[in-house]
Amino acid sequence: MMKETEDVVLMHLDFLPLKSNVNIHIGNALQMDWASIISPSKLSYIMGNPPFVGQSVRTKDQAHDMNDIWGQGEIETKLDYVICWYKKALDYINTSSTNIEIAFVSTNSICQGESVPTFWKKMIDSGAEIHFAYRSFVWDSEANEKAAVHCVIIGFSNFSRSHTKIIYTEETKTKAEHINPYLLDAPDIWITNRINKPQNGLPKMTTGS
């Protein structure tokens, strides 16, 4: 894509055209103290595309990150690695009186199943409010080996938005009064797993979404 652009504009382009105010920090974002890098009072937005990694494929270091962020043995450590960025970002903005909005691309699994009554319940109890949501879409890229994953984009913060909330579905956008963790214009509801045996005699489901 870069070469094609150069052919069109007839000039060489820098891959990373950073000329001034360069402030890149290299390291594990989940282990770093964000406030030591930049004070939240200097920010208006936090945006990113954190890695999606399921429990069955994460590394030992990633499992360690999950335990550090959520606590050893907590149910959230069984969910997708990407939720660590949500808590890290919310904890960060909760230390400041500045209104900061956050938006992350994530696997859509964080808005399904056990993720909602566990991860999202804790987020909302800690002050999170969803401001906008782009509902499930298939991830696409120019890579030869594309990841087979469905994504969402969720914008949230720790303050109530004064203007309308929006839910995006493909080419359609809909105004919403309230966006719940299922990315619906509806009140927050918490559908928990059942501990009783199925009434129809079928075996219990052990893995699924």
Feature-to-residue mapping (PLM):
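Signature of N6-adenine DNA methyltransferases within the class I
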Residues: 1-14, 18-19, 29-209
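Conserved residues in the N-terminal Rossmann fold of short-chain dehydrogenase/reductase
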Residues: 25-26
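Short, conserved active-site loop motifs that form the nucleotide-linked donor/cofactor pocket
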Residues: 22
